[in-house]
Design a protein with these regions (language model features):
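Conserved short alpha-helical segments that host acidic/polar catalytic motifs at enzyme active sites
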Residues: 1-252
């Protein structure tokens, strides 16, 4: 039953109070574990992402060490079921392209077409995950347009499929974007203690870190959380919605 393999879980957490969010990222990923049991990972600014195969809990003996080694007040994380690409550590997420880390929940069906737009890359579409191709295209669009919002408004027209992304930039900002059709769920929450913002696939991850649900991320919305607090913009004005009914039955 192919659809079961199309759900991953993403999370992005930022503490304006300079609290180490890594233990929270791990708790959130454990709460999202039912969305992907193949691999998991997390990323902080200016460091290669940490990626592991299997369940989050299988690494519980290393949690303390990971929290110390990757200590950061901003991070993103991912639990994976493979959609396109091989089930190995290389295709596990978050992925890092230049100075942007990317975690993706969804499926992009025109990978080959999209990869033709990505010039001078070192992979062939056969071994590239859909996320890698989208991330490389996005980074080249950011280089041309200077802004993530403008890049997403172009990418959404080039890409066929569904997406919820969390991004992390090396200048220490967490971003979240939900596709214009709202096919995949995305919610945001806040925790007073440490002034922590969280964006994630499901409210279970918000409860897991002791935060409160604030609202759904609107389809076509890009959220940025940084030292300047939370900013939001729309990268799409498409009003057609197409929620995945499978999400409601399987993950609710």
């Amino acid at each position: 039953f192919k659809m079961v393999k199309e759900n991953c879980g993403v999370v992005g957490i930022y503490s304006e109070g300079d609290v180490n969010v890594i233990p929270m990222v791990i708790d959130a990923l454990r709460a999202l574990q039912h969305r992907g049991q193949e691999a998991w990972g997390l990323a902080i600014p200016n460091k290669a992402p940490l990626k592991r195969l299997g369940l989050v809990s299988a690494s519980s003996g290393d949690f303390k060490k990971i929290a110390e080694e990757y200590a950061s007040h901003s991070a993103i994380g991912h639990v994976r079921y493979s959609t396109v690409g091989k089930s190995d550590l290389e295709s596990a997420q978050p992925l890092k392209v230049k100075d942007l880390c990317v975690a993706h929940n969804g499926t992009i069906s025109n990978v080959e077409e999209l990869s033709n737009l990505v010039g001078g890359c070192t992979f062939t579409p056969q071994n590239a995950s859909d996320t890698l191709v989208a991330a490389q295209r996005l980074v080249s669009l950011i280089t041309e347009n200077g802004k993530l919002g403008s890049a997403l408004s172009i990418l959404k027209n080039e890409m066929v499929g569904s997406f919820c992304f969390t991004f992390l930039s090396d200048d220490d900002a967490v971003f979240a974007a939900r596709d214009p059709k709202g096919f995949r769920p995305m919610v945001m929450g806040h925790k007073e203690d440490g002034n922590v913002h969280i964006v994630t696939s499901e409210s279970s991850a918000i409860s897991a870190i002791g935060a409160k649900l604030v609202r759904d991320v609107v389809p076509g919305e890009l959220i940025k959380i940084s030292k300047d607090g939370m900013e939001t913009e729309m990268f799409s004005d498409d009003t057609n919605r197409a929620h995945c009914s499978f999400e409601f039955t399987y993950f609710a």
